[in-house]
Amino acid sequence: EYEPKYLTADEYLSGNVREKLSQAEQFSKDSFEYRVNAEYLEKVQPKDLTPGEISVKLGTTWIPEKYIEEFVFELLSPNYYAQSKIEVKYSNLTGEWNIQGKSADKGVKATNTYGTSRISAYKIIEDSLNLRDVRIFDYIYDENGNKVAKLNIKETTIAQQKQASIKQAFEDWIWKAPVRRDDLCKIYNVRFNSIRPREYDGSHITFNGINPEIALRKHQKDAVARIMYGGNSLLGHVVGAGKTWTMVAAAMESRRLGLCNKSLFVVPNHLTEQWASEFLQLYPAANILVATKKDFEMKNRKKFCGRIATGDYDAVIIGHSQFEKIPMSAERQKTILQNQLDEIINGIIEAKTENAERYTVKQMEKTKRGLEAKIKKLNDQERKDDVVTFEEIGVDRVFVDEAHYYKNLFLYTKMRNVGGIAQTEAQKSSDLFMKTQYLDELTGGKGVIFATGTPVSNSMVELYTMQRYLQYKSLQERGLQHFDSWASTFGETVSAMELAPEGSGYRMKTRFAKFFNLPELIAMFKEVADIQTADM
């Protein structure tokens, strides 16, 4: 049974307004009073984008399989027999494209015009769909009799030229047929061009108990309003914008109004005392608990966590490394790991059925072994009754200062050797990710606040990492939970030969060279991000 509730106009008429309109239209069929909702929502719908405003590349995962198949058949003109064998499939589970029956077509277009004697056009298209640059290897035996792959630069260069011409042919073809054009525009607009930004105004907030000598600036009050009324937030504020006081005021005001029960501030280890003094400078009567190094020594940890759990504190301040020492319960960790393992096992079965790349299956087998080892380690650990878990300390909002220290979050990608992608797991990042998922569940996506002066410093991959921490559900709703889906929608990689760091020859390095569909990416990111630069 749907339980109606009142919302302010600025909240209701922002966010995913296309989805809200479709719900309002549905409800207004049964109940006339929802007609007014639909009328207001109609006025704030984003303007539909046209083909000229949408960038599409070969490999973009929101394009239906049937159109990729259509393109393949039009480009390579396989005979009727070959067509009956060839099928293009995309797996939501693994994020992998697969062309079945690649070897059925021996025509000149597949082997010569768009392919080479070493690689067929179908394999080149499959690699392109999976965002991989084509590479041709020769297999030789070293002095110990081991088989070694050696990159054939000449054949690779020829194959990559064919790959470039196929990609260009796809871009020339995709928007040509009117029916296909209309369908693709509709899919893109519904999925990505559906957000109306919400403006937050904190001018009405009274800040009871604040130091009367201190006046918060407008951008600070507005950011407090965002944290209180919006959901998970990222304060991307430059040094000097006062993000410490913004977070403190948001925590105190949220607690006063019953919007959260207990706030935990996770700050760089050497700044805990400075944070405490700034906290008390803004709210002199606040009741806060600050962790010292001693509190997290083995013999004192349980007692300190017990104080967090039972004390009626306005806020608790701990260091980054101390936060990691308050674990999620073993049961919850096992559940999360088991879910990931089930997904990977299904992915491997699917990949083998579809005859996917050996490389993909090997990567997934490696991930599977890693997850099994983690589960075994959890099972082998003695059940320590004296450990207080994160779920038990009663925290329902976490403020993470200098959140860029957590940007090294593992991601799986089919792309090879791409700059800026963490292929190793930083324990503190996976621990934080697990806790943000728990808080999302507990608070409906309102319990995580990040602050950093550098949300994106080296690579756009960091933007995706921030989105995973703060708006994972939004990524899932848009089919972007795989990094490769996100990358194929908003970015393009370029591969080039460069000198290997140890000077022992050349290697192929892939980098994100350009980004497109940026207005839609930024609109999505700004649902959580509050950015303040020096000139604002």
Regions found by a protein language model. Give the residues of each.
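Conserved pre-motif I regulatory segment
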Residues: S194-G236
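Glycine-rich, phosphate-binding/catalytic loops in enzymes
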Residues: A241, M252-E253, L280-Y283, R332-I336, ...
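Charged, low-complexity intrinsically disordered regions
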Residues: E1-S194, P284, I308, D312-V316, ...
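Conserved helix-turn-beta segment of the N-terminal RecA-like "Helicase ATP-binding" lobe
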Residues: H270-E297, K303, R307-T310, L470-S474
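Walker B catalytic acidic pair
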Residues: D401-E402
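Conserved SF1/SF2 helicase motif Ia
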Residues: V238-A241, T246-S277, Y283-N287, L442-G447
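Inter-lobe coupling linker of SF2 helicases/translocases
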Residues: R301-I348, T353, R358-K362, K366-R397, ...
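Short coil/turn segments at secondary-structure boundaries
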Residues: L184-I187, R198-T206, V238, A500-E502, ...
